[in-house]
Amino acid sequence: MLYWLTSISDGGDAFNLFRYITFRAGGAFFTALIFGFIFGRPLINLLRKRQRFGQPIREDGPESHLETKQGTPTMGGLLILSALTLATLLWARWDNGYVWLVLFVTVSFGLIGFMDDFQKVTKNSHAGVSGRVRLAMGFGIAGIAGAGALLLHPEPLAGQLALPVFKDTLINLSILFIPFCMIVIAGSANAVNLTDGLDGLAIMPVMIAAGTLGVIAYAVGRVDFTSYLDVHYVPGTGEIFVFTSALIGGGLGFLWYNAPPAAVFMGDTGSLALGGALGAIAVATKHEIVLVVVGGIFVVEALSVIIQVAYFKKTGKRVFLMAPIHHHFEKKGWQESQIVIRFWIISLILALIGLATLKVR
């Protein structure tokens, strides 16, 4: 919204700063961060008042969770979503289709998560919205986003899958492009949701991945950068950098209260929204495969559940002591803080590898 102040600028005054994506990204970051700091505690108090028992804790999970996490309120993702949405609307250009695409996916998946969290805390049970209904809604939203991306992408990128590292390599997905987008976005949302099981475990890798994808979005949205890096130019995606900066600011504001011992959990409201956002950004920037690298922690968490369920159905035995895999490490005797920080370190390493794909050709 503030971008429109440039219309009254003569090019030499302070309003001219709003032309620059980097300036507005910084503004979005600090707006979301300050919002989180100011409204975090009041929101937690409200959630604690409204949620009699807090987030239901799995009885078959690690025993320590029943002692340390019982009664902690959930739906803290509302803080991230509110900060993120406000900052994005305030600092991003409203005439940019990619911003609206990513924001649509984020808020829509947040609503699915809110419905799920609401049923859980109301019933004091893990039985929220049924898995099939949740997946159906998620795939529906992702399908709309895929169609939107198809309309926004310029030729010859529309409907194509870009391969990282390989120069000028595109795979024409044709009618499979929208189903592919559905898998990427819905898969990302649910993978982050599975990762959100320990204090601070999901939010930091999400912020690292968002920051990485934000840099990629900024780079592929500039013709000079894409010419130098020899990557595909996707005009308009640079504005996504404002969104990812707001996400990081809101995420840090949330982490202030989610740091161990957590005063609030993000819940499905936050994890589905943030995961969906990562998937949507990857689709918008034509870096879906890079998301698999940058979001490697989420991929491993999701695969651990898939492998565990499939193997147990076939043999009646388990591959892991417990899935998702972070619970396996808990059962092995790792401290919660060890798991969280080590996963953060791995996320940072994967982010650097993901950024390297911009240059390696």
Swiss-Prot record:
It is a multi-pass membrane protein. Its cofactor is Mg(2+). It is an enzyme of class 2 (transferase). Belongs to the glycosyltransferase 4 family. MraY subfamily. One of its GO terms (molecular function) is phospho-N-acetylmuramoyl-pentapeptide-transferase activity. It comes from the Bacteria. This is Phospho-N-acetylmuramoyl-pentapeptide-transferase. Pfam families: Glycos_transf_4, MraY_sig1. It comes from Dinoroseobacter shibae (strain DSM 16493 / NCIMB 14021 / DFL 12). Pathway: Cell wall biogenesis; peptidoglycan biosynthesis. Its EC number is 2.7.8.13. GO terms for biological process: cell division; cell wall organization; peptidoglycan biosynthetic process; regulation of cell shape. It catalyses: UDP-N-acetyl-alpha-D-muramoyl-L-alanyl-gamma-D-glutamyl-meso-2,6-diaminopimeloyl-D-alanyl-D-alanine + di-trans,octa-cis-undecaprenyl phosphate = di-trans,octa-cis-undecaprenyl diphospho-N-acetyl-alpha-D-muramoyl-L-alanyl-D-glutamyl-meso-2,6-diaminopimeloyl-D-alanyl-D-alanine + UMP. Keywords: Cell cycle, Cell division, Cell inner membrane, Cell membrane, Cell shape, Cell wall biogenesis/degradation, Magnesium, Membrane, Metal-binding, Peptidoglycan synthesis, Transferase, Transmembrane, Transmembrane helix. It is found in: Cell inner membrane.
